[in-house]
């Protein structure tokens, strides 16, 4: 009896599946956007609280947001980036600030 599945290359299928499984996850930039109302001290607080920056680095990023209109706070996987954006925006609203945090594909 001859092989009926000669056209199927199970080794190749398995190799393709492993290669697909090992692709690195998509990464996203988390960005703070400047506004005319949020105090600089609050932006520094956000950068320390949600992105674990020390006061010096948080101040540098806050100044970048202020003078350049926006700054990248970090690059994360989709789930982490979405969570950070949601947490920062919620924290800003709870403190009655219009600070906007967004994400975009890296």
UniProtKB/Swiss-Prot annotation:
Pfam families: ClpS. It comes from the Bacteria. Transmembrane segments: none annotated. SUPFAM superfamilies: ClpS-like (SSF54736). GO terms for biological process: protein catabolic process; proteolysis. InterPro entries: ClpS, ClpS_core, Ribosomal_bL12_C/ClpS-like. Binds to the N-terminal domain of the chaperone ClpA. NCBIfam families: PRK00033.1-3, PRK00033.1-5. Involved in the modulation of the specificity of the ClpAP-mediated ATP-dependent protein degradation. Belongs to the ClpS family. PANTHER family: ATP-DEPENDENT CLP PROTEASE ADAPTER PROTEIN CLPS, ATP-DEPENDENT CLP PROTEASE ADAPTER PROTEIN CLPS1, CHLOROPLASTIC. This is ATP-dependent Clp protease adapter protein ClpS.
